[in-house]
Amino acid sequence: MEIKDLENKIINADCMDILKQLPDKCIDLVLTDPPYNASNSSITCADKHYSTINAEWDKNFNPIPYLEECKRVLKDGGSMLFFCTYHLLGTYLNWNGLKLQQVIHWQYTNPFPAIAKVYSPAIEYIVWYSTPNYAFNKEFAKTNVILNNKAYQVDGGKFNHPSVKPSDLIKKLLLVHSNENDLVLDCFSGSGTTAIACHRLKRRFICIEKDPEYWAKSVERLKHEQAQMQLF
């Protein structure tokens, strides 16, 4: 399969199956939100429903094989950005396959309430690895703390996903760590936000989602986005 056949598509597959088909050093930026090993049930608080993660795919996840395979397909001059919570942060920090450049803190002001005798979590981490001569557009980067509300739903509640990332957050990361026409890989594309942000910012993308329901809905989101863009 030619890499051109995969570009600008959201693919319904196990990402490892697709990664193994990609040639070495073909990706400019890996930007992805893998499982967290943080499974729990959803909760209802007052008039709000907060969907937390409670799925088999979020249990016993080992990021190392994915880090290794993403490293293989990353170009010289590329970066990898992996979202995580404290559950797996140590694993990411201890991996030495690429230079650990920095840990970015995404702090949100609307966390869901704590369901145990602990603080409400209001931070997720973005672990940034790089190769030499990586892209870094400093005009879009201020500090390694990004303030942005957490998204619990997209498209007015039509698409519920337990780990939705706000489009503004993904756009900011793309602006800092990539350039127009770069090829971006998202191995766990979920609600399709990376694909949509890439489309808006003129980045090429390969997005992969294993869950058929999330995949189908994200493809519809992307089609709607593409249709809207054609109107202008």
Residue ranges: model-predicted function:
Residues 1-5, 219-232:
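Short, conserved SAM-binding/catalytic segment
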Residues 1-216:
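Core catalytic lobe of class I
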